[in-house]
Structures are given as structure tokens and as C-alpha cells.
């Protein structure tokens, strides 16, 4: 009976992990299948299974060799190599143990990374060592296994098994690395030093290098455990001497050592490519000394190691000559490494430094060209712009469309107002406000700039007594609605105007008489429909809907309104098996006995839109914040529903730190290549995800399209109503600006001298000086062009406040993604934001007014200073907000404007512009001439 119970118990222990694995696979399959992408998940499983099988064959071969090598042979008992005694024996023990410990420590770390962050494995050596408890536990287990097997070969085999399991896990979880290496196409750009296509660095180099590292780790583990088993036999430890290896054992070690040398040779050969993305010289990539010293030395060392590997193998030639050849080859390999360490700094000081520009000039040109291409700076269209010194009425007429969209509301004051007036309940949150444009005036070409903020539900803000399991997962399941405000209008009380505000029966849709926008136009072009936000930016737990419990929908005054989810998202919970699998997946057995599930109940997982996209495409980087749009959806589209209007737009990026000759970012981030390759659209109600390729020429995304063709769609197939709201992501634009500060220069001599370096100017926001962030404007890049939606960044020379240029990113229609650099004349000083703000604050009347408000208990907040092109002039606009010191609402009180020759402060923009033109003020208008020599 006891034996039967023991057998059943062992079978149960094996069955439990099997059930967990099957449950997780089932839930994941259902999750992908809701997007009709079950094939993507199946392909990923097959890739991992294939990788694990390949790794298993390799580690299995190593284990069989080890077992064969350790098998005793009676006929060779007396054939021994020289004896190791004393310190030599101790040194061999120590070396073997250090190799064993090092390999298993690296295996443990890589296995942990493979489990939690598999797409970081290609640059694992640059990541900080994690000391979290899971890794610590694994390390303790590893050390225990080693100590347990120190003196027993049989037990030491457990460490071999542990390391082999780690390798299989690592190879399986690295499916993305291997897939991209096999699928990435050539870009057609060849780097000049080694003649390889740049796609080798983008996709293949990391896979080959990582594969060789894994081979080296497994071979080192196998050899060290085998040798340790021989070195630590009981007679050896008691005598502190090792009688030596038999001839068969010595010959058996040769193939293993040869493979180790081949792996080192391959890594050293690949290290030649690493010269292409070093950052040690004056620019990125290989310089003169790298090409003329390091490249030959590394090539020589690699070839020497490869030949040495073949010489180590058993051979019929004379052992004396082969021993001499081995010594010569080993000396060459070691000498090449030593010479690199010694000669490089010496030759740099003696040879390169005295004539650095002459020697490095062609390599500087390569670095400039590569960096500009890696960040798409080579596609910038440069336009000279010589603004007039004074604003004219003709400029106002030419720039009328720009004036109609001058932004007076910053995101932060608007969010502060929303949080006090529009959150309505403690658990609602406005986490972000996005500047966008909508066609609210059909008679005009340009679209109205607005700020749209989603009203999400924050589970963490629920009162403590309401944070029950049922409330968190069945009742409080979604946010509701959004607010929309014009950027250029305010109410009589100085608070923002709203096109859309409040919720439920109190929901208001308003036009704006001052902007000549009717309520009907707002209602038509910004439909609301079902504004429930089941998927959003805030982290949210899983939800179960619909159930017999009604979900909180929105408040109606003091009464709450309830509803049932009728969307298409989620994992079915109709059968008992599906519920068991779901409860195991979410690790919550309460789902089984809740008693409120219905046949159509579904489990909503990954409700954070970025996590949702990341789960489908883990190879994408998701930078920046998603933004919500509400658009009329045309009927007849297979993948969209005309009764659903709220969608999140998420920007997906492909990047690499191994693009030849490209520079890293100025802040030290290891990124040398970046593309905004994907635009993801996430339905805020139904949770559907669509991935559109926005950079079809990017070799990395083309490689992923080969692997998962069903996952991507061309950008042209995106509904027009959504395409009209695409924007150049500010997160990428900021990185391009960082690189442009130095790499706007294309002349190697000027680049080397550092005479023409730019910087991002600073401005005063509130009481704090901050860098001017990129801002959206609707403006004309040229008088001959229509106004368009731009992302703009002013630029000034290093250590000087005058404007040197603007970088503008275009987001409209056929010009999406184009970069335009407006260059100002260098011989005429153009005031920068910092100078204009200083002149504003130095104005006696303006500073006196600020002081009066301050003494009256209000805090003056100087908003973002905008510099916009207007006709043939520049217009500087700064909104002034007042806020009570103790959490009051920010109100738009004044607008300061300047054209560089005068500064005026008035109640509104139009009054300020008129004062600038006339050059005279009034009771509520301050005007002052500026000193042009400042």
C-alpha cells in the first residue's frame, strides 16, 4: 500500500508542473487567438522548441563525451603523463574550480535574463548584475550542487545537468536573436573597413557572437567537470598528488580543447567588427590606429588560434615538431593580445596625436555619414531663414493660419485643471494630455489644435474599504471618456475652454464662438459613442466581464450608473476546463468558485496598451506615452467597427547598438540606430491590436516581417481617420535632436575643431530653469506652403543664447516624418528663448505686475515660451498663469508676445499683437522696445 501511495505521489508531483504548463499554453493561445494571431504564438513556440532541441543535441553530445572520457580502461592503467604534486597540483585544482564556478555563475545569470528579459541577451555583458532574490536563490542552488559534488564524480554530474539545462533554456528563449539573424535582409550599405553590409551588425553579429559564447561556456563546463572528477579522486586528495592522465584520456581531451580554441578564434575574428562601433577615439567607429594596428593584430591572433586548434587535434606527424608549432602559435596569439594592450596607447601618443586631423579625417567622414544615416539626419532638408527684425501687418496676414492655432495652454496647467474639475471621483486619473489636431472647421485647410486627455480608472486610488477582490476585478473595470480643449482659447474666468467635458447625462459637447467652431462640427468630427476605456495607459489588473455582477460605468451626480461589457476582448471562460486554466494562469483559485460567471464571461488580460503590444511584438521597443484619439470610423472595414471611436496610438521602435561607425547618444546610452518602424493601434474598448509598418525600408522590421508576415500590415491600409492623427514621436525626435547638436556638421575639419556645436536652449518654467522641450505648432515652413502640424525644437550655439536654427518634424499627409532644418544667419544675432525671457523679466512694468500678484497670494507661472515663424518674422509667445499658492486652479491671465524688437504683455494674444505693431500700450497693455545689442 505504501508503495502504491509513493508511486501515486511521485506521479502527482510530475503531473502538477505539466498541468501548469498546459494551462499557461492554453491561456496564451486563447489570448493570441482573440486577434486571430494564434499562428504567431504557434510559430514562437516552434522556434523555442527547435532552439531547445538543437541545444539539447549539443549538450547531450558534450555529456556523452564526458561520460565516455571518464570511463576507466584497464589496458591503460600504467600509461600515465607526468605526475602533478604540491603547488602544481593545487594550482590545477584552483584553476579548474575557478573555471567551473565562473561558467555556472554566467549560466545562471544568462538563464535568469533569458526567463525575464530574453531580448537583452545579445548585450548581457553590459547589463548591471542583478541581486534580486530569484537570482540569489539560483546562485545558492548552484553553489550547493558544486559543493555536493566536489569529491564525487557521480554527484558532480548534477552540475553538468544544471549547466546544460541553463543552456537549453537560454537557446530556446533567444528565439528572437536567431530568427532575426536568419531573416534580416541586406540594406545595400557596405561599411568600408571589412566590406560587410551594415545588416550584419544590425542582426547577425550579435547572434553569431552569442552563439559562440554559449558554445564556449558549455565546452568549458564539460571539460572542467571532467578534469575535476579526475583531479579530486580520493587517493589524489589524500596524497595531494595526481598520477596523471592516460594516453587515451589525453587524446580524448584534444577535440574538446580544439573546439574551445576554435570558439576563441571565432570570437576574436568577430572582435574585428567590434572596432566598427567602439567609442574610444574622437569619433565613433574604427579610426586610423584601429585599422592599421588593431585590425591586423586581431586577424593574426584569430588565425593563430584557428591553426592551433587543428594542431591540437591528434595527428600522425612528429610530436616534437607539433609541440614546437603549438608553442609558436600560442605565443603569437598571446602576443597579439599583449601588443594591442601595449602598443595602442603608445602609438596613439607618438603617431596619431601629432597629426590627428590628417590621419583621422577619412574616418571622421565615415562616422558623420553613418551617424546621420542611423538617425535619419541625412534626410534633413535644410532651408535658410533670415527673419525680419520687426513684425508687420503683412506677416500677420501671411501667418493667419499660424495665429489661429498659437498654443496658449501647456499640458501641465490643463492637467492640473482637469484633475480638479474633471476627475469627478477619487479613482479617476488624467495621467497624460496629448496635443493633436482635428478638422473642426470644414472651410479651413488647417486643423484645430486641441489637447485631449483620457479619463482612466486608477485601481490604486480606490478607497481602502473598496479594494475588495470583487471590486477590483468585476466592478471597477474601466475608465470613462476624455476631455478635449482648444489650445488657443480660455473662458471668461481664465480657465480652459472645453469642446468635450464631463460624463454621462452631464456630458457637454460645445462649440467655440471665438474660434468660429460649431457644436455640430465638434459632434461630427469627434464622435464619442461608447467611451468606456477598458484598455489604457495605467497599469490595471485582470478583469472578468461580463458577469452577473454589474460593472461600474460612470457617475450620474451622486448616483452611479452600471453596465455590462459587450466587447470582443478576452479569453473565454465558458467551460470548466477554461476556468481551471485561467485560474492557474492568474494564480487565483477564487475564479473557480466565484459563482457569478456566465457562458459569455471573458478574462481580460494585459490591459496596459504598451504591455499588450509588447506581448504581440516583444522585439519592439515602446518609447514615449501612447495617446488617445476619438475618430469617426468609416463603415465596411473588416478589422474595425463603425460604432467604436476611441483608439490608442502606440509608437514601436527598432534599435541597435551595433551599427557600424555610428555614434552613441551624448548621454552615454548605447544606441547607434533607431527607427520608428511600427505604429500600433489599440482599440480602447475591444482591445484589438493592429501593427502597421511605418518604415518599410528598415532592414530590422523587414526581417521580422519575414518571420511573422501575418503580424504586420502596410501603413497604407490604416483607416484614413486614424492616419490623420499620426505624429512623429517626440521621444525619437528628442534623440535625433541630441545627435544633430554635433552631427549637423558634415565637414570633418569643422567637426574635429568643435567650433560649430549646438545646444538645446533653456527657459524658465514657473521658478525652474529647464531645457526647452520640443513643442507642437501649426505653422507654415515657407510662405508658399500651407500650414501644417509640426514638432519644433529651437537650437542655439553652445554656450551662447542666440538662435542658430530650428529642427521641424512634419506629421501631415504625404510629408509625414520629413525633417526640415531652418538655419538662421550666423552674422545677425537672433534672440533665443533664454534671452527673450530675461528681457521679459527685466521689464519694470511686467516685473512689478508679477510682484503685485505674488504679494496678493498668487503664484506666477511663466509657461512654455514658443518661438514660431510668422510670415517673414519670428513671434515669441509666452502664456502667464496664476495659481493660488495652496493648490488653486491655474488660470490663463496674460499673454506676453515679442518679435525681437519689442515685448508686449496683454490680456489676450490679439491685443498683444496689435500693441507690438503700434508700439504703444494702454492701461492693461505693457509695451517696451528691446535693446538689439543684448
Curated annotation (Swiss-Prot):
Keyword Transmembrane included in the entry's annotation: yes
Subcellular location: Cell membrane
Top-level taxon: Bacteria
Bilayer topology: Multi-pass membrane protein
UniProt cross-references to InterPro entries, sorted A to Z: UPF0182 (IPR005372)
Membrane-spanning ranges: 2-22, 45-65, 86-106, 129-149, 165-185, 208-228, 251-271, 300-320, 327-347
A GO term from the CC aspect: plasma membrane
Pfam assignment, any one: UPF0182
Keywords: Cell membrane, Membrane, Transmembrane, Transmembrane helix
PANTHER family the record matches: UPF0182 PROTEIN SLL1060
Family assignment from sequence similarity: Belongs to the UPF0182 family.
Identification of the protein by name: UPF0182 protein sync_1321
Organism: Synechococcus sp. (strain CC9311)
Amino acid at each position: 500500500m505504501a508503495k502504491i501511495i509513493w508511486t501515486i505521489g511521485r506521479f502527482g508531483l510530475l503531473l502538477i508542473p505539466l498541468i501548469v504548463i498546459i494551462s499557461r499554453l492554453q491561456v496564451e493561445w486563447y489570448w493570441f487567438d482573440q486577434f486571430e494571431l494564434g499562428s504567431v504564438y504557434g510559430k514562437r513556440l516552434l522556434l523555442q522548441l527547435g532552439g531547445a532541441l538543437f541545444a539539447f543535441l549539443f549538450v547531450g553530445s558534450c555529456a556523452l563525451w564526458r561520460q565516455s572520457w571518464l570511463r576507466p580502461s584497464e589496458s591503460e592503467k600504467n600509461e600515465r603523463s607526468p605526475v602533478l604534486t604540491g603547488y602544481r597540483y593545487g594550482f590545477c585544482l584552483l584553476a579548474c574550480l575557478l573555471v567551473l564556478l565562473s561558467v555556472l555563475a554566467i549560466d545562471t545569470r544568462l538563464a535568469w535574463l533569458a526567463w525575464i528579459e530574453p531580448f537583452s541577451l545579445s548585450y548581457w555583458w553590459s547589463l548591471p548584475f542583478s541581486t534580486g532574490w530569484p537570482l540569489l536563490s539560483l546562485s545558492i542552488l548552484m553553489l550547493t550542487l558544486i559543493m555536493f559534488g566536489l569529491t564525487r564524480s557521480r554527484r558532480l554530474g548534477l552540475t553538468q545537468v544544471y549547466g546544460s539545462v541553463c543552456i537549453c533554456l537560454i537557446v530556446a528563449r533567444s528565439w528572437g536573436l536567431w530568427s532575426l539573424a536568419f531573416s534580416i535582409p541586406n540594406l545595400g550599405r557596405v561599411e568600408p573597413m571589412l566590406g560587410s553590409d551594415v545588416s550584419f551588425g544590425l542582426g547577425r553579429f550579435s547572434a553569431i557572437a552569442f552563439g559562440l559564447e554559449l558554445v564556449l561556456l558549455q565546452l568549458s563546463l564539460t571539460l572542467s567537470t571532467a578534469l575535476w572528477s579526475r583531479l579530486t579522486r580520493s587517493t589524489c586528495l589524500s596524497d595531494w598528488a595526481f598520477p596523471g592522465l592516460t594516453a587515451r584520456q589525453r587524446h580524448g581531451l584534444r577535440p574538446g580543447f580544439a573546439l574551445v580554441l576554435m570558439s576563441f578564434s571565432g570570437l576574436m575574428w568577430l572582435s574585428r567588427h567590434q572596432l566598427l562601433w567602439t567609442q574610444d577615439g574622437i569619433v565613433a567607429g574604427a579610426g586610423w590606429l584601429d585599422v592599421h594596428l588593431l585590425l591586423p593584430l586581431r586577424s593574426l591572433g584569430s588565425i593563430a588560434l584557428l591553426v592551433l586548434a587543428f594542431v591540437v587535434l591528434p595527428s600522425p606527424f612528429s610530436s616534437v615538431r607539433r609541440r614546437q608549432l603549438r608553442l609558436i602559435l600560442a605565443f603569437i596569439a598571446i602576443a597579439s593580445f599583449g601588443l594591442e594592450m601595449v602598443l595602442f596607447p603608445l602609438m596613439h601618443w607618438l603617431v596619431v596625436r601629432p597629426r590627428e586631423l590628417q590621419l583621422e579625417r577619412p574616418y571622421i567622414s565615415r562616422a558623420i555619414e553613418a551617424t546621420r544615416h542611423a538617425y535619419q539626419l541625412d534626410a534633413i532638408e535644410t532651408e535658410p531663414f533670415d527673419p525680419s527684425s520687426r513684425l508687420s501687418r503683412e506677416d500677420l496676414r501671411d501667418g493667419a493660419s499660424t495665429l489661429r492655432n498659437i498654443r496658449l495652454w501647456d499640458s501641465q496647467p490643463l492637467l492640473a485643471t482637469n484633475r480638479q474639475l474633471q476627475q469627478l471621483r477619487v479613482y479617476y486619473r488624467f495621467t497624460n494630455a496629448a496635443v493633436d489636431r482635428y478638422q473642426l472647421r470644414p472651410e479651413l485647410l488647417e486643423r484645430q489644435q486641441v489637447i485631449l486627455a483620457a479619463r482612466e480608472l486608477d485601481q490604486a486610488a480606490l478607497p481602502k474599504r473598496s479594494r475588495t477582490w470583487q471590486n477590483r476585478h468585476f466592478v471597477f473595470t474601466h475608465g470613462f471618456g476624455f476631455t478635449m480643449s482648444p489650445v488657443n482659447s480660455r473662458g471668461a474666468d481664465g480657465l480652459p475652454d472645453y469642446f468635450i467635458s464631463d460624463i454621462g447625462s452631464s456630458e457637454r459637447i460645445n462649440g467655440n464662438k471665438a474660434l468660429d467652431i460649431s457644436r455640430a462640427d465638434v459632434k461630427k468630427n469627434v464622435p464619442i459613442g461608447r467611451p468606456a476605456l477598458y484598455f489604457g495607459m495605467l497599469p490595471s489588473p485582470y478583469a472578468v466581464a461580463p458577469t452577473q455582477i454589474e460593472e461600474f460605468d460612470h457617475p450620474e451626480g451622486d448616483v452611479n450608473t452600471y453596465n455590462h461589457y459587450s466587447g470582443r476582448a478576452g479569453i473565454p471562460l465558458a467551460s470548466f476546463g477554461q476556468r481551471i486554466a485561467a485560474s492557474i494562469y492568474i494564480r487565483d483559485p477564487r475564479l473557480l468558485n466565484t459563482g457569478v460567471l456566465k457562458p459569455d464571461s471573458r478574462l481580460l488580460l494585459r490591459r496596459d496598451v504598451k504591455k499588450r503590444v509588447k506581448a504581440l511584438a516583444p522585439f519592439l521597443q515602446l518609447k514615449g506615452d501612447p495617446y488617445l484619439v476619438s475618430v469617426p470610423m468609416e463603415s465596411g472595414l473588416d478589422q474595425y467597427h463603425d460604432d467604436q471611436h476611441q483608439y490608442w496610438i502606440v509608437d514601436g521602435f527598432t534599435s541597435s547598438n551595433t551599427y557600424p561607425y555610428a555614434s552613441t547618444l551624448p548621454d552615454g546610452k548605447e544606441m547607434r540606430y533607431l527607427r520608428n518602424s511600427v505604429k500600433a493601434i489599440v482599440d480602447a474598448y475591444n482591445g484589438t491590436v493592429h501593427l502597421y509598418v511605418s518604415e518599410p525600408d528598415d532592414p530590422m522590421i523587414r526581417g521580422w516581417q519575414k518571420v511573422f508576415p501575418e503580424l504586420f500590415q502596410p501603413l497604407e491600409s490604416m483607416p484614413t481617420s486614424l492616419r490623420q492623427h499620426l505624429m512623429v514621436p517626440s521621444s525619437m525626435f528628442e534623440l535625433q535632436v541630441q545627435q544633430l547638436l554635433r552631427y549637423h556638421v558634415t565637414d570633418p575639419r569643422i567637426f574635429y575643431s568643435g567650433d560649430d556645436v549646438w545646444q538645446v536652449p533653456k527657459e524658465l518654467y514657473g521658478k525652474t530653469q529647464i531645457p526647452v522641450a520640443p513643442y507642437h505648432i501649426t505653422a507654415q515652413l515657407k510662405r508658399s506652403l500651407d500650414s501644417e502640424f509640426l514638432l519644433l525644437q529651437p537650437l542655439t550655439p553652445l554656450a551662447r543664447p542666440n538662435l542658430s536654427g530650428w529642427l521641424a518634424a512634419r506629421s501631415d499627409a504625404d510629408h509625414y516624418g520629413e525633417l526640415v532644418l531652418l538655419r538662421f544667419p550666423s552674422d545677425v544675432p537672433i534672440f533665443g528663448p533664454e534671452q527673450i525671457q530675461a528681457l521679459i523679466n527685466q521689464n519694470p512694468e511686467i516685473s512689478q505686475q508679477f510682484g503685485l500678484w505674488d504679494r496678493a497670494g498668487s503664484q506666477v507661472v511663466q509657461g512654455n515660451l514658443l518661438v514660431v515663424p510668422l510670415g517673414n518674422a519670428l513671434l515669441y509667445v509666452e502664456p502667464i498663469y496664476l495659481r493660488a499658492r495652496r493648490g488653486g486652479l491655474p488660470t490663463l491671465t496674460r499673454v506676453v508676445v515679442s518679435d525681437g524688437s519689442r515685448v508686449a504683455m496683454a490680456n489676450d494674444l490679439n491685443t498683444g499683437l496689435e500693441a507690438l505693431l503700434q508700439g504703444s500700450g494702454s492701461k492693461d497693455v505693457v509695451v517696451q522696445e528691446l535693446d538689439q545689442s543684448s
